C-alpha cells in the first residue's frame, strides 16, 4: 500500500476474511462438540482475540524495538519499513495454521430428510428469540467496542494517566481478564447445562450484561483514576464472557442445516453494527 486508500482497500480485504471466519467457526465447533460442551469450546475459541491482541501489542512493540537485529536474517524483506515487516512476520503463523486446517477431519453429519428445515418457516416461529438476541447483542457490542477503541484515550485525557501506563494496563486487563472471562463463562455454562439447565448460557449472559453496565458507569463517571480502571477491567471481563455464550445460544437454538445462517445473523449484529458503528459514533 502506497496511499491511504490503498491501505483502506487492503484492510477491507482482511476484514472480509475475518468476517467469514466467525460463522464458519461456530458451525464447525458445534459439529465437534455436544450441546453440553459447546459453551466451553466457544469460550476457549473466543479467548483467541484477547490473547492475540495482547501478543500483537507486546510482541509488536518488542519486534519494532529489536528490528535492527532481526533484519539481517530477512533477506530482501529487510528493505521494507519496520511496521510493514511486523505485519508480515505476524501473518506467517496464521498462514501456517490455515494450511493445517486442510488436514483437520470434519465430522460427518447425516441429515434425515425430516430433519431439514427451511429458513423462513423456522424464522417465523423463532423470530422473537432472534430479534431480542439481535437487539441485545447489538447494543452490548456498541458499548463494548466503543470502550475498547477509546478506553485508553479516556484514561489519558480524563485522568492524566501516561499513555504507556494506560496501554500497559489495558493489555494486562485483556490478556488476563479477557481470557479468564471467556473461558470461565464457558466452564460455568457447560456445567449448568450438564445439570439440566438448558438455557444456562442465556442466564449467565443476562447477568453479565447487567454487570457490564455497572462497570461502564464506574469507568465513565468515577473521578478516581483507580476506580475508573477498575470499571474498565470489569467491562473487559464481563464483555469477554459474551461471545461464547451468544454463539452457543444461536447454535443450540437452530436446526443443524441452518446453523450457518443463524451464525451469520449473530455476527452481523455483533460485528457489522457493534464494531463498525460503536467506535465511529463515539468518536463523531
Provide a role label for each language-model segment.
Residues 5-13, 227-234:
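Paired small-residue
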Residues 10-48:
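Cytoplasmic helix-loop-helix junction between adjacent transmembrane helices
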Residues 106-133, 158:
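Juxtamembrane intracellular "pre-TM" segments in multi-pass secondary transporters
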Residues 39-68, 174-182, 267-279:
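Glycine-rich segments within core transmembrane alpha-helices of 12-TM secondary carriers
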Residues 253-284:
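A late C-terminal transmembrane helix in Major Facilitator Superfamily
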Residues 45-102:
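Helix-loop-helix hairpin linking two adjacent transmembrane segments in secondary transporters
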Residues 126-185, 239-243, 247, 275-282:
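Extracytoplasmic gate region of multi-pass secondary transporters
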Residues 198-246:
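C-terminal transmembrane helical hairpin of 12-TM major facilitator-type secondary transporters
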